[in-house]
UniProtKB/Swiss-Prot annotation:
UniProt keyword terms in alphabetical order: Acetylation, Actin-binding, Cytoplasm, Cytoskeleton, Phosphoprotein
Compositionally biased spans, kind Pro residues: 403-421
A Pfam short name: Phostensin
The protein, known as: Phostensin
Phosphothreonine: residues bearing it: T198
Disordered as annotated region, ranges: 18-238, 294-485, 531-577
Cell compartment(s), UniProt: Cytoplasm, Cytoskeleton
Amino acid sequence: MTAIPDWKLQLLARRRQEEAAVRGREKAERDRLSQMPAWKRGILERRRAKLGLPPGEGSPVPGNAEAGPPDPDESAVLLEAIGPVHQNRFIQQERQRQQQQQQQQRNEVLGDRKAGPLEVLERRSSPGNLRDQSPKGRESREERLSPRESRDRRLVIGGAQESSSRSLRDWRQSPAEARDLSSRPAEAQKWRLSPGETPEESLRLAGSGDDSPKRKEVLESILSPGEPGDQKASPTDVHKWNLDSREPQKQSLIQLEATEWRLKSGEERKDYLEGCGREEEKLSSGIVPVTKEVQDITSSEVETAEQRPTESWKWTLNSGKARERTTWDIDTQTQKPDPPASSEKHPGPSGMEAEEEAEKEEAEAQSRPLRAQQNLCSGPSPLPPEHSGTEGSRQQEEEAAEPRPPTPAPLSPPPSAPTAPQPSGDPLMSRLFYGVKPGPGVGAPRRSGHTFTVNPRRCAPPASPAPPVNPATADAAGSGSGKKRYPTAEEILVLGGYLRLSRSCLVKGSPERHHKQLKISFSETALETTYQYPSESSVLEDLGPEPETPIAPLATQPDEEEEEEEEEEELLLQPGLQGGLRTKALIVDESCRR
């Protein structure tokens, strides 16, 4: 006897899982019916009576079909080998079922109210179809049905006020049903607001997502427009939809995200304020908006904010990290400039655009002699705090150039600082460069890629033409100055190579400073002897057939052209000398024009 194939075992296991799920749903349905109030049971009984079902029958479940004799097609389906797709019995049954459902949906849209009971009876005659059907096909059919059902339900709820006298009589039978009618508009609003919930709600109205064909057809026949009174749900159902709806969850999630974002920004601001040393400025709570921070600033900040209201408004509108330089800091710098304190107050990075706007407003508010000082002193350093020492020394240097009481000596002056003039006090230079922020150090490169530094001290030294110097002084000057220096044309004497290799462009910089660099060495005697070119006269004596005719060296191009013309005339006049003259002319042309 052959072993059972794997696909058949998988099919049997899937069928067992489906049966277990169906049994669980049956149990849940029975529990729900036992806990249901009497008025709702009466509504369900009236629905069954309209559909033509016996009134005493319980909830239609597929377990009743399982108790009967097995379907004759079932054994054939399980024993059949999987052949081509179009001949598979599962595929054929699924196609028939889909065609029936599409036809039924068309009938529902057209208002055919008799399709529901006929379909119920048809499905009850062949209950084995449900078990042959795979769960994926069932889920896809439910998803196909649910948007149309939701649309039909919306239409029915919209026309619920124009109900017939029969449905009004049904509602008058119990006052609790009249109360239930009042919950209709809220449900309609929920269905319109959240279309993603329509599959779950359509299944819940049928009863806890039951997959039985009778229950589905009950639900579909409910949706006919003439019976709006039958679609009222119990308050428990309304309560379930309220609990299970995703809109309050979405709103609460949005609120949580908003509070998290505010808390995060508040924590960042608090960390920054503690790092800057201004701990007296506390945030009242993590959800304080950014524009309310003006109320927390100290009294001196309030005064300066009154002096410049637009500037303080701009700073408070920026984020917590960009709001580093307050108006109080700018005022203290302009009134009593203390460079080390200002450099300590601005250790962190800042927004470049906000700084430029603030500096423009400062330049308009203050007088001209203070512009250069503000541009050089009030700009916060974008480098980490370890560079604040060099910034402080640079500001001390600039203030020492102005007529002020002497400050302590600079800590680490750059090498080019003593020789370069300092036109920082010039109002013309400050007017030119007031929009550009100077760098953190005099010679240090800027690390931000969006702004460039214009230092006016670089272009100030006068250009004095230096006389040709000897190699020793050239080397000393090259090693003394900080930048790279190339030798001039007067300093180089070429004899097939450079006299000193340290002055050639093969060596980048002087070898005295770069000890680890590659050292290149040639033997100068070999270069001198090897690359010595022979004279043209000797070459012509070796190659030319007539050495008795001397050839003068051609100095310039016009002389060469004149001689060529003369040679052409000689060729025309003396045809006997054509060969020798032509050979020598070619040799001269090749040697000179290269």
